[in-house]
């Protein structure tokens, strides 16, 4: 397969995504096919975002690593020393993707390390490995193109996470600001009583202890529930089951108490 055809195959994957998140596993499968190598997309913390195997490596440690989808911490950290594409590294290299305990079996093993960079930040590493055949310029062009695509996708996911976090926080702040002083006081006592993200409480007991009416507690819970911050369910004589749905809620509540 010529370089142009291989590039088109990678482009076809991106075009088929059509604005949806690119699946790192599918991306790895396509890279594996066009570069004809084992492919590992490794995050900053060593998590395997995606991988595909071209040549099976019979080694228990490698099998466990793939099953756990996690590269060893020491190896992951060492990858940060590679700041530009390093190709055709032998099995004696610190960066080899082949099991060092079986060097004699993988004497022809070659590894290529491609940093994944986006927004001026190291986002991860693309690790390629194969036996015998050297990685040529065409392979490296495809690898660097792929690492750019992966970097853009990681940045997009990070931006979405930040946006979602900001949205969750805004919802919580609006919900809390909608509470009256007595309702806020009631909520603070309720979650002191729960001491966690879910549990049972008896509203009348809290009302008596704090010196507020039961209706204040009910109204406060309704406001938070309508905002999607909590879920509550009456269990009759047992009390009310409450579960926090927005993980920013308890953080914001704690901030209010310290201010």
UniProtKB/Swiss-Prot annotation:
Location, primary (coarse class): cytoplasm
Q: Which residues form a coiled coil?
A: none
Provide the positions where the record notes the PTM Phosphoserine. Answer: 215
Q: Does the keyword Iron apply?
A: no
Q: Which UniProt keywords apply?
A: Cytoplasm, DNA-binding, Phosphoprotein, Repressor, Transcription, Transcription regulation
The subcellular localization recorded is: Cytoplasm
GO molecular function annotations of the record: DNA binding; DNA-binding transcription factor activity; GTP binding
**Belongs to which family?**
Belongs to the CodY family.
What role is this protein assigned? DNA-binding global transcriptional regulator which is involved in the adaptive response to starvation and acts by directly or indirectly controlling the expression of numerous genes in response to nutrient availability. During rapid exponential growth, CodY is highly active and represses genes whose products allow adaptation to nutrient depletion.
Protein name from the UniProt record? Global transcriptional regulator CodY
Organism of this sequence: Bacillus mycoides (strain KBAB4)
């Amino acid at each position: 397969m010529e370089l142009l055809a291989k590039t088109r195959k990678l482009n076809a994957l991106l075009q088929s995504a059509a604005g949806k998140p690119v699946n790192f596993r599918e991306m790895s499968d396509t890279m594996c096919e066009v570069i004809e190598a084992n492919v590992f997309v490794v995050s900053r913390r060593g998590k395997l975002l995606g991988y595909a195997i071209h040549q099976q490596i019979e080694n228990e440690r490698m099998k466990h690593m793939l099953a756990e989808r996690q590269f060893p911490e020491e190896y992951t950290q060492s990858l940060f020393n590679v700041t530009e594409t390093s190709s055709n590294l032998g099995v004696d290299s610190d960066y080899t993707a082949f099991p060092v305990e079986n060097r004699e079996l993988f004497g022809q093993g070659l590894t290529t390390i491609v940093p994944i960079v986006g927004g001026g930040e190291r986002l991860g590493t693309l690790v390629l490995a194969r036996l015998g055949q050297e990685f040529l310029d065409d392979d490296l062009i495809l690898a660097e193109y792929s690492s750019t695509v992966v970097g853009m996708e990681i940045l997009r996911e990070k931006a979405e996470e930040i946006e979602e976090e900001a949205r969750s926080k805004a919802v919580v702040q609006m919900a809390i600001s909608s509470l009256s002083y007595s309702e806020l006081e009631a909520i603070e006592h309720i979650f002191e009583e729960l001491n966690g993200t879910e549990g049972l409480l008896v509203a009348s007991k809290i009302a008596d202890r704090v010196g507020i009416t039961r209706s204040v507690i009910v109204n406060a819970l309704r406001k938070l529930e309508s905002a999607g911050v909590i879920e509550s369910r009456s269990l009759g004589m047992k009390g009310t089951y409450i579960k926090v749905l927005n993980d920013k809620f308890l953080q914001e509540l704690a901030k209010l108490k310290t201010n």
